[in-house]
Amino acid sequence: MSETVKTLLKNGTVVSGDMSVIEDVLIDGEKIVKVGRNLEAEDAQVVDVNGKLLFPGFIDGHTHFDLEVAGTVTADDFETGTRAAIAGGTTLVIDYASQDKGGHTLREGLEKWHEKADGKCSCDYSFHMSVVEWNEETEREIQDMINEGITSFKLYMTYPAMIVDDGDLYKIIKKLNEYGC
């Protein structure tokens, strides 16, 4: 078993949501294992980052990779889009998986998006789920989607091809509320 590479970033300005402070950051492999002042690790590569800002990985909660719309496809697929995200400091993207109209299931929509993303992403990724058709099957699938890691659901009130009627909109919101979404 190979050892992981340790890196010690010294004297960087660590920026969090509510403060910034000069600290050291010890990284073991791909994990931050310690943040503090005057850290030492004799087996680590030391990098002086004095005067540099150290941010946690950013989250982009609204991406549209490999999306077919209006007779074209968005410029980035999951490979190029996540590479660009990483270059800009984003370590998690959340794209929109979508159920297709015409009797298609949420599961089919999620699987379609996983096929586009799995094995192609350079960063962590997740999905929102777009619900465009409400029926008994879709209602039964909500819990399964939550179990699959879906934490947010998108409902359209514009775009005629994606919109659900007001009665279904109410039913969907009521059902999602039962699950705490």
Where are these regions (language model features)?
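Histidine/acidic-residue-rich, glycine-tolerant segments that coordinate divalent metal ions
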Residues: Q99-E111, K116-C181
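Divalent metal-coordination and catalytic microenvironments
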Residues: G12, E30, G51, H62, ...
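Metal-associated gating/positioning segment near the N- to mid-region
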Residues: N50-K120, E137
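Short strand->helix junction
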Residues: V15, V21, G71, Q99, ...
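Histidine-rich, glycine-flanked metal-binding segment
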Residues: S2-G57
